[in-house]
């Protein structure tokens, strides 16, 4: 993200062999990302990078950078297109992005979700997405998904066919009430993982948007959700989440003979990062899982005031929960999260 009043955003790239390229975007382009970088989307050989403030920070100070939305080549990181804050003046603090093609780029802001046609720079509000949550989209099967926050919640489906979203309700009767959705992610079989909370109970849910079938597994903690809206990360049926600096894993068993409470016994406490390293004072903006290796990536900072003392952790939890597979220190400035090219 960078410091929201004084710094531009940046992109740190870690190679397959574990080499770190600090501020890779600037290294390639000679210029910088916009202020408070928030989210990235991969589509058709391009990466779409959205920033909250672009070339003007929250207090109105102009900054020298490439703007609010930047489109780069996914292999070279070379800038192909840039949109300034004035180009996207309709948007109010954008935070998340998804892309289906050049004419269907979806951006979430404080009002809801807009569709951007990057060819014409036209922004169109998607009806039915009012107050869309500050959370990452799910993109699959040619559609984009977010969720409806609050007690009347469900999955919101956005199709490129029109600018009207469709709400898909969760089943009315469930073992663990869904009063609050903490986050969603795509499951490998086309279902959607849903982390939820209701009446004092947290659950991991696997939801099919076509049949509306849901499988629930209760967990013992209410996971921490960072400002980027990431509540958990998944690899196959392994779900990783955190409460403070303590990391947990749920091996999600879909056996229909099991009830939701079976998840309580299936949950594993893996490690407490603050017990390993005194500089791991805070988990910052969620977890990520490498789609090929299954290694879990975690960002920590010492404190908000001491954010330059930070660590990127990589764990192979099948091998060790105490000794990280890799550890990269002092590369981030308020990290927005981990982003991997889609597919295995």
Predicted feature descriptions by range:
Residues 20-32, 78-88, 121-128, 164-174, ...:
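A short beta-strand motif characteristic of beta-propeller blades
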């Amino acid at each position: 993200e960078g410091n929201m009043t004084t710094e531009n955003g940046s992109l740190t790239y870690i190679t397959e062999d574990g080499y770190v390229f600090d501020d890779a975007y600037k290294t390639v382009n000679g210029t910088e990302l916009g202020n408070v970088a928030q989210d990235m989307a991969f589509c058709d050989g391009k990466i779409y990078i959205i920033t909250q403030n672009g070339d003007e920070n929250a207090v109105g100070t102009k900054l020298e950078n490439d703007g609010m939305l930047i489109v780069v080549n996914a292999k070279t990181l070379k800038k192909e297109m840039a949109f300034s804050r004035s180009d996207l003046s309709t948007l109010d603090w954008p935070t998340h992005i998804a892309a289906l093609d050049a004419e269907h780029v979806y951006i979430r802001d404080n009002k809801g979700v807009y569709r951007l046609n990057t060819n014409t720079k036209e922004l169109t509000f998607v009806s039915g997405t009012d107050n869309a949550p500050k959370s990452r989209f799910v993109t699959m099967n040619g559609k984009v998904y977010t969720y409806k926050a609050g007690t009347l919640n469900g999955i919101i489906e956005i199709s490129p066919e029109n600018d009207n979203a469709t709400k898909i309700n969760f089943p009315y009767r469930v073992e663990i009430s869904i009063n609050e959705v903490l986050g969603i992610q795509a499951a490998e079989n086309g279902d959607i993982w849903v982390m939820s909370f209701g009446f004092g109970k947290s659950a991991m849910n696997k939801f099919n948007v076509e049949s509306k079938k849901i499988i629930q597994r209760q967990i013992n903690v209410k996971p921490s959700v960072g400002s980027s809206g990431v509540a958990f990360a998944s690899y196959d049926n392994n779900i990783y989440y955190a409460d403070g600096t303590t990391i947990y894993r749920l091996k999600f068993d879909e056996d229909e003979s099991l009830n939701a409470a079976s998840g309580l016994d299936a949950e594993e406490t893996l490690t407490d990062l603050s017990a390993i390293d005194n500089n791991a004072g805070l988990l910052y903006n969620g977890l990520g899982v490498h789609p090929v290796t299954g290694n879990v990536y975690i960002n920590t900072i010492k404190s908000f005031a001491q954010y330059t003392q930070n660590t990127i952790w990589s764990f192979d939890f099948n091998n060790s929960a105490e000794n990280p597979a890799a550890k990269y220190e002092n590369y981030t400035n308020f990290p927005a999260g981990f982003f991997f090219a889609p597919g295995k």
